[in-house]
Amino acid sequence: MNINDFMFTLINELNENLFYEVELYKECNKYDKTYLLRVIAKRHNKKYDYGFSIHENWLDSISINEIINFLLMQ
């Protein structure tokens, strides 16, 4: 999946009020898992940690596809 497909999927899954922030993210032209987790948390009006600890090891172990799948399941 390329960045355009990924961002299209993400935009379709997000609330409209996050569209501007996602557009800013697209400008970065990179994958940033921490950013994606913040977006997911905001989407659900939760705290940043979304009920789990964010550690570098955990971020390294999760794939972009897993994050997309998480979004699609919501």
Annotate each language-model stretch with its function.
Residues 1-26:
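Negatively charged, low-complexity tracts enriched in Asp/Glu with abundant Ser/Thr
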Residues 19-63:
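Acidic, low-complexity, intrinsically disordered interaction modules
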Residues 58-74:
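Mixed-charge, Lys/Arg-enriched low-complexity segments
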